[in-house]
Amino acid sequence: QGGMSVVLQVSLKELMISLADKNNDPNFRKALEVAEQRMVTNNSDYITLFIQAYKELNTDAKLAQLFATRNNKDVLTYESSDAAVEKYVRTQAGDAINRTYSIIQSRIDQVGTKQPIVTLEPNKGRITVEIAGVDNPARVRKLLQATANLEFWEAYRGTDIAKSINDANT
């Protein structure tokens, strides 16, 4: 029976953009690109390479200027140290990689093969999948590559906004 070996890469670049609330600072965007290029030839992790590149491009800038947003105001402020920001970003990246790993594991269980091998390289954000006895590689590839598009909407109860509606009517 045929087998299949796949290497999946978690996009830490996209995570960083999301954590920075889609910041359009040119130095931020350039540092993301530089870190991605350096990943090819360097054994360091993406976050280390990003921070190095950002500091090279903008020696006076603090990381909090990028990553302290309204979404994480309980953890980071504009006065947060670079070490605190780096710790936060690393935690978020680790969580994202582990969530992705769990999702991939559950998707492989759906394939129904015996003894799949799934290995995680957390520093590189890579997940290697080896599956024996694959009879439909296209289905497996589609299953592994599918992205989950989660959207969160702020919801209100009618009682929460009733006073505001009454005030608007008077």
Regions found by a protein language model. Give the residues of each.
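A structural signal for conserved, well-ordered secondary-structure elements
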Residues: 1-170
